[in-house]
Amino acid sequence: MSQSDVVSQTFRALVESADRKFGRVRDLPLHGNRSQNHHSFHKVFKAYMRLWKYQQENRTKLVESGLNRWEIGEIASRIGQLYFNQYMRTSEARFIVEAYVFYEAILSRRYFEGVKVKDLGVRFKELRFYARFLLVSLIFNRTDMLNLLVDRFTHLVDDCKTNFRETNFREWKLVVQEIVRFMKADKAFTNIRPLRYCAMFDSHPTSLPYVARFHAKKVLKFKDAILTSYHRNEVKFAEITLDTYRMMQCLEWEPTGSFYPKRPVVFNDHSGASIDHSGASGVIDMNFAADLTDPTLPPNPRKSVLYRPSVTHLIAVIATICEELPPESIMLIYLSASGKAGISNVSQLENSGGSKKSSNNNVLSRISRKQNSSTPEYHINGTKESSDYYENYLWFGPRGNGGPNNLYPGDIIPFTRRPLFLIIDSDDSHAFKAERGETAALFLSPLRPAFKDQSSADTTQNGSQFTFFLTAPLQAFCQMVGFTSSDSDSDFYSDAEKIISTSFSEWEVILCTSTSLDLVWAQVLSDPFLRRLILRFIFCRCVLSLFCPPEDSEQYLPVCIPHLPVSVSPKSELVQSSVRRLANHLGVAEYFKCLT
């Protein structure tokens, strides 16, 4: 047996060993068992690094033995997939960076394109590579790369349909449609500012000393979050919906300006550039990942993103994470789903037999109500009797209206034994006013969205308005009043962001110096992510209270439990003045009562 044969056999054995380990890690649950997951990841990562190093050291002999370029691309793709899966388990930024580095190298070195392959199996590998790279670029917020990948991916699917006419590529066409729809829904105002926590926008020098000095009797650390949404026909890509994507981004750190360098995306298929594709090059600049990582930032809170979970699976994940939650920590649960009847948008409400009612100032969309409203009747103290914990619910199910698909307020009560920050975004969110047990922090969305332009009210096209306010308040404000990014330049929006930033700084001082701030809020105020959510809630509530007619206030206003101080209520002159400044700056003050 020649030396080349020995090298080839060793290489194949390493491939098989790594793939077996990869299969075991891929099938592990994404949630819980941190130590076990870390150990398993380390083993499979070590196997692939050994394989990668071996092919680099023996590349010439492997090429002589018939190694194809796409085989190197498949190994790199597996490593990228491994990193991405670990990112989804841990939310550690370095893993999404490493995944991006490997996928970008595959694309730039054209591992799947070096030879015109007519093998259907290889084409499917290439299609899967593009789909995975699209998801990584989306989460990594690489807009230029996304645009390039969508164009490449679309052409690849069309080429596969032409060359493999007997094969059905309908599923891949749906993938193309999904990403195009997602990017269309998320493209407005994308250049204003990142959704992630950014020191430039979210750390306010004026109020920083007050935040630094603030100390409650008990301080909780934000460690874990569960994010899920379940609506009919909602905007999504792969297993990431638009609402959960926005929340994911909102709960991560944005590196400082010197990081995430905007390397130009230049991969011209027809430029004639002298790129050597004759050999199976396996060199990837793994040091580039260090250039994309900001070592000054603390770790991201771990996020468990559930795609269309069953109620039993959702409860099981909550229980697992509660069990593993470190002492003196708090868990955030974000639930976006339709209420009682499984109605997910305004157009469905109107088709359900409801009557229309326009606002007095003709600003609000004509949002219909059901003649027999499902809004629960609450007692004077804003709560319900314990027998009502299982009367209203969120709806997690593909069809029908059966009990197994219903998540009741009472289902959450056992988990309030641990500190809980609960965000309910639903047309039946106020049912969770009945939630009892240990006191939890609650944000409950309005029962109805409010827009100047009725077409914007369709959550299946634009996502939830409440979630948008919590994750991108200026963009949500502009969408509500029908103000588009084409209406003005970047400096104009930068000034609008400064108005919001100044307001948030003022409100931070109020919260940090308030003597009436409930302990539930005080114990999380030191956390930058949760504090930012509180400030954005204050903004959202005041905006909607001034935008909506008073007789419909309960339908269109969000609720927080327990109450925040009166000094940051919608009736506060200081809070209203902030909305006034923003509305005047954008030239939309006539849409708000008491502002003109």
Language-model segments: residues:
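N-terminal alpha-helical scaffolding segments that mark the starts
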Residues: 1-50, 56-57
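TPR repeat positional signature
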Residues: 14, 21, 76, 83, ...
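Short coil/turn linking the two alpha-helices of tandem helical-hairpin repeats
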Residues: 25-30, 80, 85-91, 134, ...
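Flexible helix-coil transition and linker loops at the boundaries of alpha-helical arrays
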Residues: 51-70, 108-121
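Cytosolic small-GTPase signaling regions in large eukaryotic proteins
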Residues: 98-226, 230, 502-541
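Functional beta-strand-loop-alpha-helix junction segments that form "active/interaction loops"
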Residues: 244, 251-331, 349-352, 374-375, ...
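Cysteine protease catalytic core and zymogen-processing segment of caspase-like enzymes
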Residues: 341-474
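Active-site-proximal C-terminal subdomain of hydrolase catalytic domains
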Residues: 420-545
